[in-house]
C-alpha cells in the first residue's frame, strides 16, 4: 500500500486561522508510523482565488466603482493590516461589506454544490472546481484521502470532491471525519457509496489504526476505535465501533502546520490555534452539543506542555499571535499559563473563550493581560436569570457585569456571545 495519505479541508469556512484538527492528525500519524500525511487546504485556496479574481475584475460579482474600492481596501486590511485595521469604525464598515460579499458568493456556490449532489444538475463552474480539487488531491498518488469537516457548509463540497476523487482513482479509500461528521448520523454520510469510512470524535488513534489495517489488507475493521465502516452483512450496511479514550497529551506531538502557506489566511499576521484541553471543564450547559466532537470527559494538558507548544510554534514558525480553541479554560489554568509565559519571556498575544465566573478576580485578569491576553469571548448567553438557570450556566447577571468590568480594567477587550430567540 502506498504510504502517502492526504487530508483535505474543503470550502466553505472563512480562513482566518490555520486548520488544527488535520495538523494534529498529521503529526500523530507521522510520529507513530512511516505514513506521510499532507494537509491540503482547498478552503483557503478557494477564498484567495475568489478575492484575487474579484480584485482583478474577473468575478461574476458586479461592483460599482465605490464598492470595488471598498472591497480592495477590505482585502488589503485583512491581508496586510495597516492603520485601517486598527481604526474600529472603518474596520467594522469594511469587514461587514467584505463579509456580506463573501456570503453572497458562498451561497451561489453552495446552491450549485447542493444541486449537483442532490439532483445531478451541474453548473459548469461547480463541476470544473470539483474536478480541479480532486486532481490536486490525487497529484501525489495517495492511497487514502481524508476529508476534515468542521461545519455544515463544508459537507456538500466535500461530498462532490470526494465523488470525483473516487471517479479518477477508484482504488483510493475515502475517509470522512471532523466535528460536523461526528454529529451526522452514519446513514447520511454512507448514502454516498464512494465514502468508505467515517472517523468520529477524536480521530488520531482511530485514523492511524485504520491506515495500518488497510496496509495489512484487512477487510474487517471491528477492533478499531472511533470508526464507522461498511459491512454488507448487517442490516444497516455499516458498523459503528465503540469510541476510545482520547490520546494522552503526554504522547501527542505538537500539531504540524508545515503544509500550510501562512500568507493564505485573512489576518495581517497568522494566528495559530492552541488546544490545551479536550472537552469542557463545565460541561453542563443544556443547549451545547460541542461534546460530540470529543471522546470522554474533560482532559487538560499540564502547563509545561501548553507553554512548550507555544514556544515551539514561536521558534518554528516565527509567529506571535495565538487563539486558544478550548471549550473553556478555568481561571486557575489561565493564571498558571500566563505566569509561565511571563517567566519565560515569551512575547505573544492571544485570545480565548471563557465563562464569566466571579472567580475571574482582578488579579487573575491582570496577570492574564501581562501574559499576552488581549481578547476574551465570553459565553454570557442571556441576562435573564430564569433563562440562565434553565441553561445551567452557573452565572448571574450581576456577576457577569462585574467580571466584564474587571476584564476591561485589566485592558482586555470583551466579546459577548448572546443567544436570542
Specify the residue positions occupied by each region the protein language model found.
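Conserved N-terminal ligand/cofactor-binding loop architecture of enzyme catalytic domains
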Residues: 38-127
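Glycine-rich beta-alpha loop elements in corrinoid/cobalamin-binding modules
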Residues: 3-4, 12-49, 102-242
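Active-site cores of enzymes that catalyze phosphoryl transfer or operate on phosphate-rich substrates
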Residues: 93-133, 144, 269-290, 294-297
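Hydrophobic/aromatic residues located in beta-strands of well-ordered beta-sheets
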Residues: 5, 37, 174, 224-225, ...
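Residue-level recognition of beta-strand->loop/alpha-helix junctions
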Residues: 41-43, 292, 418
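Radical SAM [4Fe-4S] cluster-binding motif and immediate context
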Residues: 250-415
Amino acid at each position: 500500500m502506498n504510504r502517502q495519505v492526504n487530508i483535505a479541508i474543503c470550502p466553505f469556512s472563512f480562513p482566518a486561522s490555520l486548520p488544527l484538527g488535520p495538523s494534529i492528525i498529521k503529526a500523530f500519524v507521522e510520529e507513530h508510523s512511516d505514513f506521510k500525511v499532507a494537509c491540503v487546504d482547498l478552503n483557503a485556496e478557494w477564498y484567495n482565488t475568489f478575492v484575487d479574481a474579484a480584485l482583478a475584475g474577473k468575478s461574476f460579482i458586479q461592483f460599482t466603482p465605490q464598492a470595488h474600492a471598498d472591497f480592495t481596501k477590505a482585502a488589503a486590511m485583512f491581508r496586510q493590516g495597516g492603520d485601517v485595521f486598527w481604526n474600529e469604525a472603518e474596520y467594522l464598515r469594511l469587514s461587514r461589506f467584505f463579509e456580506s460579499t463573501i456570503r453572497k458568493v458562498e451561497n451561489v456556490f453552495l446552491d450549485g454544490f447542493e444541486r449537483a449532489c442532490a439532483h445531478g444538475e451541474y453548473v459548469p463552474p461547480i463541476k470544473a472546481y470539483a474536478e480541479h480539487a480532486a486532481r490536486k488531491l490525487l497529484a501525489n498518488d495517495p492511497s487514502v484521502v481524508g476529508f476534515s469537516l468542521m461545519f455544515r457548509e463544508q459537507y456538500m463540497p466535500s461530498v462532490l470532491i470526494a465523488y470525483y476523487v473516487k471517479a479518477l482513482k477508484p482504488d483510493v479509500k475515502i475517509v470522512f471525519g471532523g466535528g460536523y461528521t461526528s454529529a451526522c448520523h452514519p446513514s447520511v454520510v454512507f448514502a454516498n457509496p464512494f465514502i468508505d469510512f467515517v472517523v468520529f470524535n477524536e480521530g488520531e488513534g482511530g485514523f492511524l489504526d485504520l491506515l495500518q489495517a488497510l496496509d495489512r489488507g484487512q477487510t474487517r475493521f471491528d477492533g478499531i476505535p472511533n470508526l464507522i465502516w461498511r459491512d454488507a452483512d448487517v442490516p444497516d450496511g455499516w458498523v459503528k465501533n465503540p469510541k476510545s479514550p482520547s490520546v494522552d497529551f503526554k504522547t501527542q506531538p505538537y500539531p504540524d502546520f508545515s503544509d500550510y502557506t501562512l500568507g493564505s489566511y485573512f489576518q495581517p499576521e497568522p494566528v495559530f490555534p492552541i488546544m490545551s484541553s479536550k472537552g469542557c471543564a463545565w460541561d453542563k450547559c443544556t443547549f451545547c452539543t460541542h461534546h460530540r466532537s470529543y471522546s470522554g470527559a474533560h482532559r487538560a494538558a499540564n502547563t509545561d506542555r501548553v507553554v512548550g507548544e507555544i514556544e515551539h510554534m514561536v521558534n518554528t514558525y516565527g509567529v506571535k499571535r495565538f487563539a486558544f480553541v478550548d471549550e473553556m479554560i478555568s481561571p486557575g489554568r489561565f493564571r498558571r499559563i500566563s505566569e509561565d509565559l511571563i517567566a519565560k519571556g515569551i512575547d505573544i498575544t492571544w485570545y480565548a473563550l471563557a465563562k464569566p465566573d466571579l472567580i475571574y478576580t482582578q488579579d487573575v485578569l491582570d496577570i492574564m493581560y501581562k501574559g499576552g491576553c488581549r481578547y476574551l469571548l465570553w459565553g454570557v448567553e442571556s441576562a435573564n436569570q430564569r433563562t440562565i438557570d434553565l441553561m445551567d450556566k452557573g452565572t448571574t447577571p450581576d456577576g457577569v457585569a462585574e467580571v466584564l468590568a474587571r476584564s476591561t480594567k485589566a485592558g482586555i477587550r470583551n466579546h459577548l456571545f448572546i443567544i436570542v430567540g
